[in-house]
Structures are given as structure tokens and as C-alpha cells.
């Protein structure tokens, strides 16, 4: 996934993975892992683990990542 996608395209990618289990508007840790493995594999080559990344993105501590929280990752990797 290129981060140069439109907001609508990013939302569709997010929703595709969020719909796999539980709340279709939130990514679980497993859904985030699948999204990164399939769409952003270069992130896994860095020093960040999925657990660390998930903790960083889950700003409200509810155990899931909302689209707004996911956008933090998109902004981070597009810089």
C-alpha cells in the first residue's frame, strides 16, 4: 500500500481489514498485523514490533485501533 493513496482509498483498506473480526470500525491487534504484513511489509523490517506499534497507535487504550488512530501511522510513514 502506498501512503500516497487518497483518504477514501485508505479508508477502504482499513475497513477491509477491520471487518475480518469484531468491530468493523476498529482494528484488533491481529487485524493490524495482517494489514501491515500485506500492505506495509517494510514496517516489519524496522525496529518496531507489532506490539509496540499497536500500543503507540491505541491512544485511548481500548485495545483496538480506530481509523483516526490508524491515520497517525499513515502520517508517520508518509513523512
Swiss-Prot record:
Protein name per its UniProtKB record: Protein S100-G
Tell me which residues bind Ca(2+) 1.
26, 31
Which gene is transcribed and translated to give this protein?
S100G
Which SUPFAM superfamilies did the record assign?
EF-hand
Residues where Phosphoserine is found: 47
Provide one Gene Ontology cellular component: apical plasma membrane
Q: Where is the EF-hand domain?
A: 13-48, 45-79
Q: What PANTHER family does the database record attribute to this sequence?
A: PROTEIN S100-G, S100 CALCIUM-BINDING PROTEIN
Q: Which residues carry this modification: N-acetylserine?
A: 2
> What InterPro entries does the entry give?
EF-hand-dom_pair, EF_Hand_1_Ca_BS, EF_hand_dom, S-100_dom, S100/CaBP7/8-like_CS, S100_Ca-bd_sub
- Keyword set, alphabetical order: Acetylation, Calcium, Metal-binding, Phosphoprotein, Repeat, Vitamin D
Q: Which domain of life is it from?
A: Eukaryota
Name the positions where Ca(2+) 2 binds: 58, 60, 62, 64, 69
